[in-house]
């Protein structure tokens, strides 16, 4: 079977990861001790995508938990599903990265990375046919961003032909946890551009907005935000875990979603959004799902897709529904909003359908968009980066760990290149001169 090895790094990564395991354990009928109490064979049919079967019929998540301080790990361990993880798969340091990317990437993290890779190797060896890796982390802190990207590049070296998928929480425009977020995020993006196949950009502010506006929560907690993220993660991986009429795996997704290797930053969305306490009392229809799914208010990254154009889109529907209706609705959206889809990639919307809906819903849809509007997010980080870097503010924390200013300059220009690549394809049309395209291609290759 096509297994996925899951890695969660840093505080944010571990909290999102823990939520993710709660949700998919629930979907597969697995209780907090790892025992199966489900009611359908379908739950077990492809359970080994995410779980190892241990002796006595226990199911153990194929998860590796990494952090540079023990705090978050302890709270995961004492959380609702804390006992389901394999104890050897908790790898943590004592010192913490102190929100410093350099500590995560070069000093503290580099000391711990070999013991993490040993665990990764163990997990990969117990796989029958490893499909790829998924990492949950944030880009604003020290461990998830610095050590997370270090892990990615090390795993890339060892498993070059496996898909590398990340769920990356990007610093928000308004909600900021740390002053040095722009530095950490820019240095991380510099790595992600080169080393991942698919990166889902998730943004706390967008999640807050969804909680306020759609879910009507007056004071959203991180628990609520993480619940939204885990819904998306569960949706993206549905096709791998359950049989469906039209299946997609990580690689198919990458092939359909990434027209140019550097442009692999996606905006996720989910429908129907329901507040945690209130299970909905109305029947959902496919048209409603598609409508809500493409709605700008539904995006989990703080970018407005109406400010750019979609290069590609993937939609994953869950539940019993007519394929014909799904296809009609998707076409309908594309025809009505054709100006928001680039015309030089015909049929750029891929749909997958899985028969099994999430707990408590008749049907749901997960949206993944590769839109040029994501450049807003990178522009925002880049502006904040430049403002601080121009004055060399806070730099001593990084140079003190052995980093060089050059590395900052490189990361900055790589991010700016990314923005201009998105911009270039936003403006490109189908009938421009081919010569112009070749020159551009050449430039991109030279960069």
Swiss-Prot record:
InterPro entries: Beta-tubulin_BS (IPR013838), Beta_tubulin (IPR002453), Tub_FtsZ_C (IPR008280), Tubulin (IPR000217), Tubulin/FtsZ-like_C (IPR037103), Tubulin/FtsZ_2-layer-sand-dom (IPR018316), Tubulin/FtsZ_GTPase_sf (IPR036525), Tubulin_C (IPR023123). The keyword Lipid metabolism does not apply. GO terms for biological process: microtubule-based process. One of its GO terms (cellular component) is cytoplasm. Belongs to the tubulin family. Dimer of alpha and beta chains. A typical microtubule is a hollow water-filled tube with an outer diameter of 25 nm and an inner diameter of 15 nM. Alpha-beta heterodimers associate head-to-tail to form protofilaments running lengthwise along the microtubule wall with the beta-tubulin subunit facing the microtubule plus end conferring a structural polarity. Microtubules usually have 13 protofilaments but different protofilament numbers can be found in some organisms and specialized cells. This is Tubulin beta-1 chain. It comes from Manduca sexta (Tobacco hawkmoth).
């Amino acid at each position: 079977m096509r297994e996925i090895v899951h890695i969660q790094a840093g505080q944010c990564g571990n909290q999102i990861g823990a939520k993710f395991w709660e949700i998919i354990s629930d979907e597969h009928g697995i209780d907090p001790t790892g025992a199966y109490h489900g009611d359908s064979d379908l739950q077990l049919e492809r359970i080994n995508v995410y779980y190892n079967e241990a002796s006595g019929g226990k199911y153990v998540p194929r998860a590796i938990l990494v952090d540079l301080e023990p705090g978050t790990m302890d709270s995961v361990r004492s959380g609702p599903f804390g006992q389901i993880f394999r104890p050897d798969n908790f790898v943590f340091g004592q010192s913490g990265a102190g929100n410093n990317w350099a500590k995560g990437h070069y000093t503290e993290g580099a000391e711990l990375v070999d013991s993490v890779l040993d665990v990764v190797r163990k997990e990969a060896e117990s796989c029958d046919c490893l499909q790829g890796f998924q990492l949950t982390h944030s880009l604003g802190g020290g461990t998830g961003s610095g050590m997370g990207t270090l892990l990615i590049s090390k795993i890339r070296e060892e498993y070059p032909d496996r898909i590398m998928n990340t769920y990356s929480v990007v610093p928000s425009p308004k909600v900021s946890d740390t002053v040095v977020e722009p530095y950490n995020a820019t240095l991380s993006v510099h790595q992600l551009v080169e080393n991942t196949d698919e990166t889902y950009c998730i943004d706390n502010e967008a999640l807050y907005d969804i909680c306020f506006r759609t879910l009507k929560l007056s004071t959203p907690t991180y628990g609520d935000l993480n619940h939204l993220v885990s819904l998306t993660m569960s949706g993206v991986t549905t096709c791998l875990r359950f049989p469906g009429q039209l299946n997609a795996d990580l690689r198919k997704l990458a092939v359909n979603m990434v027209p140019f290797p550097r442009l692999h930053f996606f905006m996720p969305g989910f429908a129907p959004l329901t507040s945690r306490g209130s299970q909905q009392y109305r029947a959902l229809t496919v048209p409603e799902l598609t409508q809500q799914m493409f709605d700008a208010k539904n995006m989990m990254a703080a970018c407005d897709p109406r400010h750019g154009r979609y290069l590609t889109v993937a939609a994953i529907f869950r539940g019993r529904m007519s394929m014909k209706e799904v296809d009609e609705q998707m076409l309908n959206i594309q025809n009505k909003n054709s100006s928001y889809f680039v015309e030089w990639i015909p049929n750029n919307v891929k749909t997958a359908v899985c028969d099994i809906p999430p707990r408590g819903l008749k049907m749901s849809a997960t949206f993944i968009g590769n839109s040029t509007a994501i450049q807003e997010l990178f522009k925002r980080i880049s502006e904040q980066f430049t403002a601080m870097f121009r004055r060399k503010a806070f730099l001593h924390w990084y140079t003190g760990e052995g980093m060089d200013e050059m590395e900052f300059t490189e990361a900055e220009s790589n991010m700016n290149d990314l923005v201009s690549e998105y911009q270039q394809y936003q403006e490109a049309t189908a009938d421009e001169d081919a010569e112009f395209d070749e020159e551009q291609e050449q430039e991109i290759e030279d960069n």
